[in-house]
């Protein structure tokens, strides 16, 4: 397919067979890759970034529809249809052996690749107080908060960018639960090499439950992730 390359990695993942190599050009791939076929121990299926760390698979989308709300806080509205059957802004982090309060969502807001801190209310978002437990307290004043507009079926996100214009800066939100993971089990002998994998809205993964992650084998064997 060198003369007529696929537009999406997942297009290749649907048809790749044992022994195939999928070479991925540099760029940002905003998609979920769901490999369908397993390789074999003597004939792996390999997904390789042509340029090491040049191909980025991200679970986020850029948002440029922010409007000023109050002080340093902006607000945007996102149609829930964007998220499909998994909305990171209605899904909480919780589960077995998770002992913190279940008040944080799996989604997040990013300003120039820096994750903002989730607030418990719009007021908290506006106040932008330091979170003392943070390893970088000065960054913890960048806050976000979310709520649902049931009538319009929209996710509403407020964010405090401290004077930055979110429509000019690179501001992203999580959209996808995973970046590279088979939806079915037993898709073995896969190699994934040289990618940046980032910004998926994964759930909590206790040892006795579904092992979620930005990238993972989903109960398959013989994987190499490098």
Q: How would you name each of these model-derived features?
A:
Residues 1-226:
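Extracellular polysaccharide-degrading/modifying enzymes targeting complex plant/algal/animal polysaccharides
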